[in-house]
C-alpha cells in the first residue's frame, strides 16, 4: 500500500511496518534563536490585562484576593452540572469496563457511541449549538469522574473539546463556522488538534507544514506531517496549523485551518502505542496536497500560533482534572488491596 492514496475519501490507516519515514515533505526548517524568539513573542497574548495569581506568586506577592473567595456557579448552571454528572456517573458505572480497554488497547465503539448520545462530547459547547453548556468547574468535575474510571477516555474527551475544533472555533471562529462545526462536535464528530511535527515541538518557528494558496484564491493546499495527534486516528475534524508562504495578497505565517479528515490526501500513517493510556487514539498524520477551502481558515493568516497557544492554555485547565481522577482511582485500588492482603497473620 502506498503511503498516500489521493483517491480515497476516508483516512488511510497504514500499518507501522509499512509507514514511510516521518520526514516533512517541505524539508526541515532551520531558524536561528532570534527568529524563534520573535515568533514566540509575536504569539503572546496582549489583550489580557487582569493580574495573574501565578505571576504574582512568582514575584513574591501572595495575592489571596485573586483566588478567594472562589466564584461559584449560579443556580441554573449548578443544577445543569449536577444533573449531567449524575447521568455520566451512571454511564461510567454500567457501560465502561476499564479492564477491557486496557486489554484491547482501544475504547469500544459502543462506549464512544454512548458518550456521544450522553452529550459528553459537547460538555463545553453552548446549548444553542446542541451542547451541554457546562461551566469550566463542572467540565473539570466530569473529566475527573471519567479519569477515575479510564484516563484514556478522559484524554479523548478533553482533546476533542479543550484543544480540538470546538475551542478555537468558540474563541476565534466566525458565526458561520460556529453554526457549521459546533453542532457536529457536540453530538456526532470527534476532533483532533494537529500542531506538533517530527522536528517541531516547543519551537514553532520551525513549523514545516505548508498551506499554499491556490491560483483561484478559493482554497489552500496543505502538505506536511503531524506527530502525537491525539484523537487523530479516529477524528472526523482536524484543527491543523500550517505555514502560509508570504506572497502578493497574502500576509503569510502560521495559520489555523479546520480540515475534514475524509479529505483526499490525508493519511493516518500509524497509531502510537503507550505504556499507559492504552486506549488513546494517538497517531502520525500526513497531509499531501490536501485542498482546504478558504472559509475553513480560522482567523487571519499569521494568527495561527496565537490561536494554537491560546487554545492550549485553555486545554491545560482540563488535564489536571483527568490526572486527579486517575490518582483518585489509584488510591482507591491501593486502599482496597491494603485491606484485603494478609501478611504476618494480619
Residue ranges and their predicted role:
Residues 199-202, 228-231, 247-248, 274-281:
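Short Gly/Pro-enriched turn/cap motifs at secondary-structure boundaries
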Residues 117-188, 230-237:
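Internal helix-loop-helix
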Residues 181, 196, 206-207, 225-227, ...:
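Short beta-alpha junctions and helix-cap segments that line functional grooves
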Residues 209-212:
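A structural signal for short hydrophobic beta-strand segments in well-ordered beta-sheet cores
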Residues 218-219, 223-268:
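A short core secondary-structure module
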Residues 267-346:
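Glycine-rich beta->alpha junctions and the first turn(s) of the following alpha-helix
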Residues 187-195:
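A short, Trp-centered hydrophobic/proline-enriched beta-strand micro-motif
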Residues 2-98, 105-106, 110:
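Extended, charge-enriched "interface" segments that sit outside catalytic cores
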Amino acid at each position: 500500500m502506498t503511503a498516500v492514496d489521493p483517491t480515497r475519501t476516508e483516512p488511510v490507516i497504514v500499518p507501522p511496518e509499512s509507514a514511510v519515514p516521518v520526514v516533512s515533505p517541505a524539508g526541515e526548517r532551520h531558524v536561528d534563536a532570534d527568529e524563534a524568539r520573535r515568533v514566540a513573542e509575536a504569539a503572546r497574548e496582549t489583550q489580557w490585562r487582569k493580574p495573574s495569581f501565578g505571576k504574582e506568586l512568582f514575584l513574591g506577592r501572595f495575592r489571596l484576593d485573586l483566588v478567594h473567595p472562589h466564584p461559584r456557579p449560579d443556580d441554573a448552571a449548578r443544577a445543569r452540572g449536577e444533573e449531567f454528572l449524575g447521568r455520566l456517573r451512571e454511564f461510567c458505572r454500567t457501560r465502561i469496563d476499564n479492564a477491557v480497554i486496557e486489554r484491547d488497547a482501544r475504547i469500544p465503539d459502543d462506549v464512544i457511541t454512548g458518550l456521544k448520545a450522553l452529550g459528553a462530547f459537547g460538555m463545553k459547547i453552548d446549548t444553542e449549538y446542541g451542547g451541554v453548556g457546562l461551566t469550566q468547574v463542572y467540565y473539570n468535575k466530569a473529566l475527573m469522574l471519567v479519569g477515575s474510571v479510564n484516563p484514556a477516555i478522559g484524554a479523548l474527551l478533553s482533546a476533542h473539546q479543550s484543544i480540538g475544533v470546538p475551542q478555537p472555533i468558540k474563541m476565534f471562529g466566525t458565526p458561520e463556522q460556529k453554526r457549521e462545526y459546533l453542532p457536529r462536535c457536540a453530538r456526532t464528530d470527534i476532533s483532533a488538534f494537529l500542531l506538533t511535527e517530527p522536528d517541531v515541538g516547543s519551537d514553532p518557528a520551525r513549523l514545516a507544514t505548508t498551506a499554499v494558496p491556490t491560483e483561484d484564491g478559493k482554497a489552500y493546499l496543505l502538505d506536511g506531517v503531524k506527530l502525537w495527534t491525539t484523537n487523530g486516528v479516529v477524528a472526523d475534524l482536524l484543527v491543523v496549523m500550517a505555514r502560509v508562504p508570504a506572497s502578493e495578497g497574502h500576509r503569510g505565517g502560521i495559520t489555523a485551518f479546520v480540515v475534514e479528515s475524509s479529505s483526499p490526501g490525508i493519511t493516518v500513517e500509524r497509531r502510537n502505542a503507550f505504556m499507559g493510556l492504552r486506549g488513546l487514539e494517538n497517531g502520525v498524520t500526513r497531509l499531501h496536497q490536501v485542498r482546504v477551502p478558504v472559509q475553513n481558515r480560522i482567523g487571519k493568516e499569521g494568527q495561527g500560533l496565537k490561536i494554537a497557544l491560546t487554545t492550549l492554555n485553555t486545554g491545560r485547565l482540563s488535564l489536571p482534572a483527568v490526572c486527579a481522577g486517575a490518582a483518585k482511582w489509584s488510591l482507591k485500588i491501593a486502599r482496597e488491596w491494603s485491606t484485603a492482603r494478609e501478611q504476618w497473620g494480619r
